[in-house]
């Protein structure tokens, strides 16, 4: 089950994986999880979930309003929570299931102008670890993929000129922008039933940005 399936990384996953996916995405505005997910009641088998919706709300701290924090938290954390609650019984019925959340390098290292997204993604990672612990006996794995800046539809404004692209590359230890296909391959790995002894982990696919100078 892919939530936010029109995202760049989700599309890369669908194009490069042999798995069969059930997809949900938004065309305009916000995905209505209450209404849109009702049709899952008729789906018999779900053995994986990837939650893609996210935000890139970069502002100086003094410019952030309470609604900025609440909106980021609603999309990144409450949305993921709502989907998991909807399908957790179906995941428990599977012979080993995997849930993957998408975080950000900003959840673990301090980046300017990332206060609201860093807070919400940190909360998402914390929720993933708690759920991993809660559902170990049910054999439902919860993991997180945390990329650095990746070339996606969300990051278009951050990479709209050659100068911005080069500046972003320079900030990365490997001097690269993230490739959606590489992020998708990591997600595909975590969805594989053969890797179901891995849970509660944050996989940082970030060109070394989290640990290297």
Predicted segments — roles?
Residues 1-21:
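Canonical Rossmann dinucleotide-binding motif of NAD(H)/NADP(H)-dependent dehydrogenases/reductases
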Residues 64, 110-118, 130:
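Active-site loop-to-helix junction immediately N-terminal to the catalytic Tyr of the SDR YXXXK motif
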Residues 104:
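Residue(s) in the substrate-gating loop at a strand-loop-helix junction
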């Amino acid at each position: 089950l892919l939530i936010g399936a029109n995202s760049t990384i989700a599309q890369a996953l669908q194009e490069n994986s042999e798995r069969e996916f059930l997809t949900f995405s938004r065309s305009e505005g916000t995905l209505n999880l209450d209404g849109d997910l009702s049709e899952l009641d008729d789906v018999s088998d779900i053995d994986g979930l990837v939650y893609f919706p996210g935000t890139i709300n970069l502002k100086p701290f003094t410019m952030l309003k309470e609604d900025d924090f609440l909106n980021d938290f609603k999309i990144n954390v409450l949305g993921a929570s709502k989907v998991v609650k909807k399908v957790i019984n179906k995941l428990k019925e599977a012979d080993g299931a995997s849930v993957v959340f998408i975080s950000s390098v900003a959840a673990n290292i301090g980046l300017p102008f990332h206060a609201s997204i860093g807070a919400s993604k940190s909360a998402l990672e914390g929720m993933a670890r708690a759920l991993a612990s809660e559902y170990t006996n049910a054999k439902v794995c919860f993991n997180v993929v945390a990329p650095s800046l990746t070339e996606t539809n969300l990051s278009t404004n951050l990479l709209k000129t050659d100068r911005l692209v080069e500046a972003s590359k320079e900030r990365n230890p490997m001097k690269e922008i993230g490739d959606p296909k590489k992020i998708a391959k990591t997600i595909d790995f975590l969805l594989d039933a053969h890797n179901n002894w891995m849970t509660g982990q944050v996989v940082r696919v970030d060109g070394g940005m989290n640990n290297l100078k």
